[in-house]
C-alpha cells in the first residue's frame, strides 16, 4: 500500500501553463512547472516613490496565479487540472513614510438671483505624500478627488404672473408682528417670516402660531442672530459648530411653536452666506434666501420712503422688511400704503415656498 502511494506521488501531473498543456514531474511544484515550461520571467525593478528605477531586477521576481489565486511561493504543489498563469514580475516600490492630508472641496458661484441653492456633495478629497526611505524622494498623489459644490443663485421664472414675496426678519416682536399680521390679513397677503429663535418664547410662540395658522411661511433667521462671536451680523465669524447650533436651535424653536417640522429654507444674518458658512450649514438647509429689494426699513427713513421701495416691485421679486429688531411702526404704515397699490397693479403676495414652485434659473 505504501509503495503504491509513493508511486502515485511520483507520477507527473497534467496542468495548463500560460494557456498550453504541460506535464510536471518531480515534486510537481510551481518551480518544477517553470523549469518544464522553459519560461524565464523577468523580475521587476525596485522603484522610488516617484516611479524612477532605483535597482533594476530587484522587484517582484515573477507574477503567478494558480486557478486565479495569486501565488508567490515557488514551492506551491500542483495538482492535475491546475491552471497556471505566469508572467514577468512587477515593480516593487521602496518602503516609505506616508502622510495623508485633506484636499478641501471648493465652492464656485454662478448666477445673480436671490435664491441660493447648493449643488454637489461637498466632500474633501485625500492627498497622500510619500517620502522614500531609500531615495529620500517626496512624491504626492491624489487618492480621492474632492467633490466640489456650486452655489446657484437663481430667480423664479414667473412668466406673466404678477407675484412677489414679502419677507420679514428679526421677529417675532411684541406689538409689531401683530400689526404686520393684521395688515397682511386685511389685504389677503401671504408672507414669509425669518424668525430669531431665541424670541420664540412666551408671546413669541403665540405670534408664530398665529402666523403659521394664517398661511404664512415660518423660517429661521438663526437662533440668536449670530450674537456673541458672530457680532450679531455674520455666522462666518463663528466656529463651525456654533454656526450649526444657530441653525439647529432655530429649527427647534419653530418646531416647538408650530408642532411640526420646520422649513429648512433660511436667511442668514446680514445675508452673509460665504464659503465658510456654506461649508458649516449648507448640508442642513435646502435654500438660503437673499432679496431683490431692500425696503431700507432698518434705517427708519420714513414710511413713505419704505412704501416707495415696496412699490418698486416687479414680478418674482423678493422684498426685505423687518417686523423685529426695534421700532417698526414705519414698516407697518408703509405696508398699509404699498399693499393696496400693488394689488391695484394686479400683484399677488406669495410665500417663498410658493415662489420657488416656479421654474428657477
What are these regions (language model features)?
Residues 69, 83, 89-91, 198, ...:
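Solvent-exposed coil/turn segments that connect beta secondary-structure elements
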Residues 1-102:
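Ubiquitin-like/PB1-type beta-grasp interaction modules and other compact soluble beta-rich domains
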Residues 54-56, 73-74, 79-165, 174-178, ...:
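N-terminal pre-catalytic segment of deacetylase/amide-hydrolase enzymes
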Residues 134-235, 246-249, 253, 257, ...:
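Active-site beta->alpha N-cap acidic-glycine motif
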Residues 14-16, 83-87, 165-167, 192, ...:
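Soluble periplasmic/extracytoplasmic beta-strand elements of cell-envelope proteins
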Residues 39, 189, 216, 286, ...:
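Short phosphate-binding/catalytic loops that engage adenosine nucleotides
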Residues 179, 201-206, 225-348, 353-361:
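Catalytic domains of cell-wall/extracellular-matrix polysaccharide-remodeling enzymes
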Amino acid at each position: 500500500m505504501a509503495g503504491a502511494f509513493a508511486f502515485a506521488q511520483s507520477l507527473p501531473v497534467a496542468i495548463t501553463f500560460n494557456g498550453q498543456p504541460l506535464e510536471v514531474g518531480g515534486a510537481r511544484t510551481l518551480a518544477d512547472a517553470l523549469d518544464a515550461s522553459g519560461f524565464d520571467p523577468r523580475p521587476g525593478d525596485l522603484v522610488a516613490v516617484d516611479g524612477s528605477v532605483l535597482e533594476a531586477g530587484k522587484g517582484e521576481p515573477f507574477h503567478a496565479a494558480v486557478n486565479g489565486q495569486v501565488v508567490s511561493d515557488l514551492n506551491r504543489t500542483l495538482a492535475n487540472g491546475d491552471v497556471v498563469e505566469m508572467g514577468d514580475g512587477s515593480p516593487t516600490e521602496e518602503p516609505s513614510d506616508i502622510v495623508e492630508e485633506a484636499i478641501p472641496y471648493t465652492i464656485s458661484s454662478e448666477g445673480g438671483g436671490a435664491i441660493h441653492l447648493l449643488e454637489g456633495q461637498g466632500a474633501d478629497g485625500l492627498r497622500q505624500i510619500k517620502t522614500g526611505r531609500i531615495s529620500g524622494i517626496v512624491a504626492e498623489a491624489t487618492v480621492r478627488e474632492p467633490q466640489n459644490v456650486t452655489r446657484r443663485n437663481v430667480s423664479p421664472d414667473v412668466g406673466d404672473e404678477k407675484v412677489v414675496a414679502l419677507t420679514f426678519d428679526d421677529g417675532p416682536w411684541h406689538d409689531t408682528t401683530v400689526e404686520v399680521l393684521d395688515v397682511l390679513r386685511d389685504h389677503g397677503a401671504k408672507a414669509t417670516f425669518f424668525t430669531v429663535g431665541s424670541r420664540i418664547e412666551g408671546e413669541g410662540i403665540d405670534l408664530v402660531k398665529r402666523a403659521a395658522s394664517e398661511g404664512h411661511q415660518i423660517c429661521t433667521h438663526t437662533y440668536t442672530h449670530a450674537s456673541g462671536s458672530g457680532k450679531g451680523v455674520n455666522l462666518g465669524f463663528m466656529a463651525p459648530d456654533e454656526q450649526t447650533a444657530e441653525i439647529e436651535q432655530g429649527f427647534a424653536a419653530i418646531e416647538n411653536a408650530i408642532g411640526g417640522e420646520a422649513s429648512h429654507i433660511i436667511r442668514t444674518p446680514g445675508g452673509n452666506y460665504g464659503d465658510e458658512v456654506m461649508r458649516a450649514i449648507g448640508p442642513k438647509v435646502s435654500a438660503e434666501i437673499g432679496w431683490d429689494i431692500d425696503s431700507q426699513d432698518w434705517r427708519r427713513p420714513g414710511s413713505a420712503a419704505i412704501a416707495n421701495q415696496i412699490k418698486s416691485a416687479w414680478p418674482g421679486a423678493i422684498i426685505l422688511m423687518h417686523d423685529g429688531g426695534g421700532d417698526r411702526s414705519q414698516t407697518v404704515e408703509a405696508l398699509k400704503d404699498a399693499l393696496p397699490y400693488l394689488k391695484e397693479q394686479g400683484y399677488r403676495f406669495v410665500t417663498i415656498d410658493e415662489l420657488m414652485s416656479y421654474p428657477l434659473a
